[in-house]
């Protein structure tokens, strides 16, 4: 049992780091009610609800079926890559960057192998960038946006007006980089298993409608979570097991850590000083080290400039492999495949990310 627990924490490095930070933070501030008060239950309930709904759609094959249908008329390797990258970009806005990659990267690997294409690195790397940058346009595109939205720091319109220009430039560059692949003709296998029973589609369609009401803040987050939990327990219990509870636990640990930091006056004063100077730069650089979701949770209480924070953590998903949890997901999925060239993947990933980060920072400089 102990061995399995240790293996789990070795595998989930981000959660392990978050837990260590939370425990060490008790040296700054002894455990008290402030740590419980620091846990943002609205964000956790929304995140749980959205992950459950998307897991339901994935489980019944709906996302896979849509993806295969959209690639049905593709006849070239270049076209296949462009369609999959564009799908990642668009899907990430609706179901989060993590889920977009969990759905489309395995499908990409499958389709490329069926076409006789062994090297998928270029396409998977571009899909990862597409998911990270496409997701920043909407409040539900990634966990850090959802946190800033549910905590009342930014509105849906704020995300759109602030980040859409960056996303548009990123999409154009992504499509241009797809042109580097050859126009080699391929035969794409688009056969797909039929989705599950219609009652599942009705269930998750209804829950999606409730989620839209919760996102619009018409329905309380707890009411959505209750409906999701009761609905899935009654009709589709298997979906509950597919929710990413590791991400939820990571959020809880960082909420506890942030509560300790806020209660420690010297550390609080230092962070406020740093964030007052350049919130975007601090957020971006912090993301490179601890990933952009934890960076957002850590830095949010210490700045009033939520837009600069959002820009910093969203663009901060570019750069290092650990800058975004979604990037680690892609790397794991690719690395688990037969004949994976992890060293080459890392080199291509780093080069492409540096390129996009330079372009995005150049655009930011032009807009300021």
Describe these PLM feature segments.
Residues 116-183, 187-193, 330-360:
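Membrane-core helix-loop-helix motifs of multi-pass transport proteins
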Residues 4, 68, 180-205, 237-241:
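Flexible interhelical linker loops that connect adjacent transmembrane helices
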Residues 2-28, 39-52, 201-210, 218-233, ...:
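Hydrophobic mid-bilayer segments of alpha-helices in multi-pass membrane transport proteins
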Residues 38, 60, 64-69, 207-304:
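Transmembrane helical segments that form the transport core of multi-pass membrane transport proteins
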Residues 5-11, 33-43, 154-166, 193-198, ...:
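Interfacial loop-to-helix junctions that mark the boundaries of transmembrane helices
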Residues 160-171, 281-368:
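C-terminal transmembrane helix pair
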Residues 41-43, 72-85, 114-123, 199-202, ...:
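Membrane-interfacial loop-to-helix junctions in multi-pass transporters
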Residues 85-86, 90-133, 297-311, 339-341, ...:
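Hydrophobic transmembrane alpha-helices that form the pore/transport pathway of multi-pass ion
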